[in-house]
C-alpha cells in the first residue's frame, strides 16, 4: 500500500465501528501531539508515516499508515 496524501479521505477501526476523516498533515519522523488534552505519540518513518486527521465532526486524531484504509 502506498502512502496517503494530504486531503485523502481515510477510515480506521474504532470501537465496534469505524472513524473517518481527511488527512491534514503527514509525518515521516516520530511525532507527539496534544489532542483534546491527551499526549498522543506515533512512531513514523518514510515507509510507515503518521497522519494527522480531521474527522468529519471536526475532532482530530493521529494515526499510523497501518491503521488506515481509503474511505469510499
Language model: regions and residue ranges:
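Intrinsically disordered, low-complexity, charged/polar segments
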Residues: 41-72
Amino acid at each position: 500500500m502506498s502512502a496517503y496524501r494530504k486531503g485523502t479521505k481515510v477510515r480506521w477501526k474504532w470501537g465496534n465501528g469505524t472513524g473517518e476523516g481527511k488527512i491534514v498533515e503527514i509525518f515521516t519522523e516520530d511525532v507527539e501531539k496534544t489532542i483534546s488534552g491527551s499526549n498522543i505519540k506515533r512512531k513514523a518513518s518514510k515507509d510507515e508515516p503518521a497522519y494527522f486527521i480531521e474527522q468529519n465532526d471536526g475532532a482530530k486524531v493521529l494515526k499510523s499508515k497501518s491503521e488506515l484504509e481509503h474511505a469510499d
